[in-house]
UniProtKB/Swiss-Prot annotation:
InterPro entries: Ribosomal_uL1 (IPR002143), Ribosomal_uL1-like (IPR023674), Ribosomal_uL1/biogenesis (IPR028364), Ribosomal_uL1_3-a/b-sand (IPR016095), Ribosomal_uL1_arc (IPR023669), Ribosomal_uL1_CS (IPR023673). One of its GO terms (biological process) is regulation of translation. Part of the 50S ribosomal subunit. One of its GO terms (cellular component) is large ribosomal subunit. This is Large ribosomal subunit protein uL1. Binds directly to 23S rRNA. Probably involved in E site tRNA release. Protein L1 is also a translational repressor protein, it controls the translation of its operon by binding to its mRNA. Disulfide bonds: none annotated. The keyword Metal-binding does not apply. It comes from the Archaea. Belongs to the universal ribosomal protein uL1 family. One of its GO terms (molecular function) is tRNA binding.
Length: 222
């Protein structure tokens, strides 16, 4: 079910967040923080881990493929940023520092089904808690379409606290595009948890800027 959101309030708060804080020597991201209430996180179904494709991604995500054989060829043709072979996966075994570095280096990973047991054993303990486990691409699925979708996607995740943090824009980006990204994320959250029931508050902020608070009553149209 769709939810009506007050676009004027969101637009005003986006503008306020972009103006707030000191100038930095780098292009800051615009972040959306959604705080939910009365959510029972002892229930596994409430600890979500979703991918949401943004209409206007602030940057193209970096994608790496764990690959071999035909899948390696298809991943290269799809334009992934890096190929990690079976031998390279096995060489990572026990090297926690290298695995952590790899997890930070790329936004998303893809892999064929037959490599998942090895990946679960080698990188799973570090990738899993970080939400970086590879997206499994079955043999009958077009690798290029998966890569293109991941380039535009953000991860919407709830683990131990009822809080979702997502990058929805960047300094210099059209504010209408940032608004469209925020609305897309909120609609996706609403599919899982009714915002009218569970939303407590929202914050919009730059990477190094102060959070601009939006109360649920302000953003939920009546």
């Amino acid at each position: 079910m769709s939810v009506l959101l007050n676009r004027d309030v969101l637009t005003s708060k986006i503008a306020e967040a972009l103006k707030a804080g000191k100038p930095r020597r780098f292009r800051q991201s615009v972040e959306l923080i959604v705080v939910l209430r009365e959510l029972d996180l002892s229930k596994p179904e409430n600890r979500i881990n979703l991918l949401v494709e943004l209409p206007h991604p602030p940057k193209a995500n970096k994608i790496a493929a764990f690959a071999h054989g035909v899948f390696e060829v298809n991943a290269k043709n799809a334009g992934v940023d890096a190929i990690i072979t079976r031998d390279q996966i096995e060489s990572l075994s026990g090297n926690k520092r290298a695995i952590r570095k790899l997890a930070k280096q790329y936004d998303f990973f893809i892999a064929p089904p037959d490599l998942m047991p090895l990946l679960g054993r080698v990188v799973g303990p570090i990738f899993g808690p970080r939400g970086k486990m590879p997206e499994v691409v079955p043999p009958n699925v077009d690798v290029k379409s998966v890569v293109e979708r991941l380039r535009r996607s953000v991860r919407v995740r709830i683990r131990n606290e009822p809080v979702i943090k997502v990058r929805v824009g960047a300094e210099g980006q059209d504010q209408k595009e940032i608004l469209a990204n925020i609305l897309t994320v909120l609609e996706e959250i609403n599919r899982k948890f009714s915002l009218k029931q569970y939303l407590k508050e929202i914050y919009v902020k730059k990477t190094m800027g102060p959070p601009i608070k939006i109360r649920a009553v302000e953003v939920l149209s009546r």
